[in-house]
């Protein structure tokens, strides 16, 4: 007879080697605590360990578990490599497939794909191993946003208002990734939409303090002066439009289980999709728990819902 999820062991996998390791080290223990509060058997795994020298295959083989809750952010935990490894081991896991994760993690590939199917996303230029500031100035107008193609949590992202800031932003982005993206700046409010089990939750409006050029790493995880607007401030029709666009962007990449979609709105009222996060943060500052709480789902119930969704998907309930 098949096990129920309550009879199974859930491995919460966090840590990793990416620049988002510190965020993941906050998310993972909170997820484990929430699952234990709901009565689940939980083991915790800091992938690679604190010295990043451990073999992840040996680590995964060293513990007994039935379902993996992926609380890794960025790197191998969000680009599909850990997901592929778990599939080889025959272990179900939370979130999207290796292919969907890999596509969503690469901002350049995502934007090329969206341009092909009509999902509105800001104009951009991309570069590999170098950046041509002269070309950027020829084809784009300031301000621009400079990003590493495959990082999250706004790590390595900077807004450039002039050539000096552009040169500095390009150098910083190349410290994190050989592929970089230079994107048109959308002048307007930013929103984020949580998706769980193919349902778009109420959007959150993001309003960083005036001293932040954009909703950056500090505004996300450190500062206490960022405003989170729930309700988001849109009228019902615009909110519905935003939710449907977020769902379209999420589904187009083949995502499922759960995720978060980041969107800007320009001064003309047009929405522009920035990216899809397939393993969003689950810290005390994170947006997915915030959206869930707004509709009456506490943290422990949220992580239970995500885990149960993954378990049900493989028919083991």
Curated annotation (Swiss-Prot):
GO terms for molecular function: ATP binding; D-alanine-D-alanine ligase activity; metal ion binding. Pathway: Cell wall biogenesis; peptidoglycan biosynthesis. ATP binds at residues 137-192. Mg(2+) 1 binds at residues 262, 275. InterPro entries: ATP-grasp (IPR011761), ATP_grasp_subdomain_1 (IPR013815), D-Ala_lig_Van_CS (IPR000291), D_ala_D_ala (IPR005905), Dala_Dala_lig_C (IPR011095), Dala_Dala_lig_N (IPR011127), PreATP-grasp_dom_sf (IPR016185). It is an enzyme of class 6 (ligase). Belongs to the D-alanine--D-alanine ligase family. This is D-alanine--D-alanine ligase.
């Amino acid at each position: 007879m098949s096990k129920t999820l309550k009879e199974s062991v859930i491995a919460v996998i966090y840590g990793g080697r990416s620049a988002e390791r510190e965020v993941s080290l906050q998310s993972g223990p909170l997820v484990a605590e929430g699952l234990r509060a709901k009565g689940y058997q939980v083991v915790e795994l800091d992938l690679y360990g604190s010295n990043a020298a451990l073999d992840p295959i040996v680590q995964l083989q060293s513990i007994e578990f039935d379902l993996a809750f992926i609380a890794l952010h960025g790197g191998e935990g969000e680009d599909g490599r850990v997901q592929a490894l778990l599939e080889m081991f025959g272990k179900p896991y939370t979130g999207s497939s290796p292919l969907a994760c890999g596509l969503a993690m690469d901002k350049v590939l995502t934007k090329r794909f969206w341009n092909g199917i009509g999902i509105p996303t800001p104009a951009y230029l991309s570069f590999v191993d170098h950046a041509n500031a002269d070309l950027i100035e020829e084809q784009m107008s300031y301000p621009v946003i400079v990003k590493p193609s495959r990082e999250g949590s706004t790590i390595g992202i900077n807004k450039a208002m002039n050539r000096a800031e552009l040169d500095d932003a390009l150098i910083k982005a190349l410290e994190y990734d050989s592929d970089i993206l230079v994107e048109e700046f959308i002048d307007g409010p930013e929103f984020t939409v949580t998706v769980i089990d193919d349902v778009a939750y109420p959007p959150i409006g993001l309003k960083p303090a005036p001293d932040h050029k954009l909703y950056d790493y500090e505004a996300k995880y450190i500062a206490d002066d960022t405003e989170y607007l729930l309700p988001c401030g849109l009228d019902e029709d615009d909110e519905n439009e935003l939710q449907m666009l977020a769902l379209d962007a999420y589904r187009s990449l083949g995502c499922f289980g759960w995720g978060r979609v980041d969107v800007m709105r320009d001064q003309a009222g047009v929405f522009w999709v920035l990216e899809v996060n397939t393993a969003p943060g689950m810290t005390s500052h994170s947006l997915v728990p915030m959206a869930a709480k707004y509709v009456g789902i506490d943290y422990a119930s949220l992580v239970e819902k995500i885990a149960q969704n993954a378990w049900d998907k493989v028919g083991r309930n």
